Amino acid sequence: NQLFFYNTFTYQFNLPPFFSAAVPVLNQLKNGEYNKSPPLTSIRVLKSLAGQNFKHFAKTGEWGKDLYSDLVSGELKSSIKVETWNHQSGDEVNLPSVCNSTQSTLSAKYIRLPFSVYYSSYEDHSKFVVAYSERSSQPPIPYVCIGDINRQ
């Protein structure tokens, strides 16, 4: 049901009848439907075949807030560094870093890897989040998020 929070832009959709019956939300997505009324966000725990738990965050465009600073950092109870594609276009404006007394959401502008690779978020289309501790006396927080939403 997490997919129902996305307004998907699907080029082609092949939905076999057995999938449609087993997962009815796929038929709704095929018809261009998605969640437009509260709740406009959803957090679910997904479990891998190996038993590892993953938190999945979903939101609709109607929510009108930043996924990372308004949902992810609060749920993780951690400050986060967010790297997303930094291309502004039309009415999409890159969001600034958000610093407050409990959790900060910082926009990562550059990535420097140990094997002499360096690139900026302007050139990179990936999206990821790394949780961190603002106090050097606290151990790092063990969260890494992989996403598909820009901070715009």
Predicted segments with their positions:
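PLD/PLD-like phosphodiesterase catalytic module centered on the HKD motif
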Residues: N1-Q152
